[in-house]
């Protein structure tokens, strides 16, 4: 790793149809083996399904879901004097969004269903309503941070 300085932070690009950075972040996380066109197909089908289910703006549902799943605080393993402590740390907005997207995709992959677009749309609608596996993961992370609050001074 270079010690010359900090790396420039890359700004995420927008997707071609919705001109939305969150959609592009989702596409890049859902993509496997460089198949970006397939990832775009999955996302756009999921967005159409959200439109059909909720009859509201699907991008606002997406934003609401990601905002609901984004954690404020997480735990990080830190070795102190021979024992490892789970130290609670605050999370920035970009890292929080990345975690939220990862959790949403993981939860939708675990769901039973026909295809990924259907599973992703269901998970996003559930997350926007405040339920689902991704929300449970966020609450679990917050509980862990609260339980290990005593180790916060090890930061």
Swiss-Prot record:
Keyword set includes Ribonucleoprotein: yes
GO BP annotations, alphabetical order: translation
Keywords, comma-separated and alphabetical: Chloroplast, Plastid, Ribonucleoprotein, Ribosomal protein, RNA-binding, rRNA-binding
GO cellular component term, pick one: small ribosomal subunit
Any GO molecular function: structural constituent of ribosome
Listed SUPFAM superfamilies: Ribosomal protein S7
A Pfam family per the record: Ribosomal_S7
Gene3D superfamilies: Ribosomal protein S7 domain
CDD domains: uS7_Chloroplast
TM segment ranges: none
Compartment(s) where it occurs, according to its Swiss-Prot or TrEMBL record: Plastid, Chloroplast
Family: Belongs to the universal ribosomal protein uS7 family.
Task of the protein: One of the primary rRNA binding proteins, it binds directly to 16S rRNA where it nucleates assembly of the head domain of the 30S subunit.
Quaternary structure note: Part of the 30S ribosomal subunit.
Record HAMAP family: Ribosomal_uS7_B
NCBIfam families: rpsG_bact (TIGR01029)
Protein name: Small ribosomal subunit protein uS7c
Organism: Ananas comosus (Pineapple)
Taxonomic lineage from the root: Eukaryota, Viridiplantae, Streptophyta, Embryophyta, Tracheophyta
């Amino acid at each position: 790793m270079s010690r010359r300085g900090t790396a420039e932070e890359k700004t995420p690009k927008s997707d071609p149809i919705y001109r939305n950075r969150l959609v592009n972040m989702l596409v890049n996380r859902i993509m496997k083996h460089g198949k970006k066109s397939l990832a775009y197909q999955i996302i756009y089908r999921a967005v159409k399904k959200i439109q059909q289910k909720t009859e509201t703006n699907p991008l606002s549902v997406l934003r609401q879901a990601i905002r609901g799943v984004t954690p404020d605080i997480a735990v990080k393993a830190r070795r102190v004097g021979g024992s490892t402590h789970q130290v609670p740390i605050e999370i920035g907005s970009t890292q929080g969004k990345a975690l939220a997207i990862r959790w949403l995709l993981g939860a939708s992959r675990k769901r039973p269903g026909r295809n990924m677009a259907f599973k992703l749309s269901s998970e996003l609608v559930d997350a926007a309503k405040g339920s689902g596996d991704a929300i449970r993961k966020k609450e679990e992370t917050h509980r862990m941070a609260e339980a290990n609050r005593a180790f916060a001074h090890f930061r």
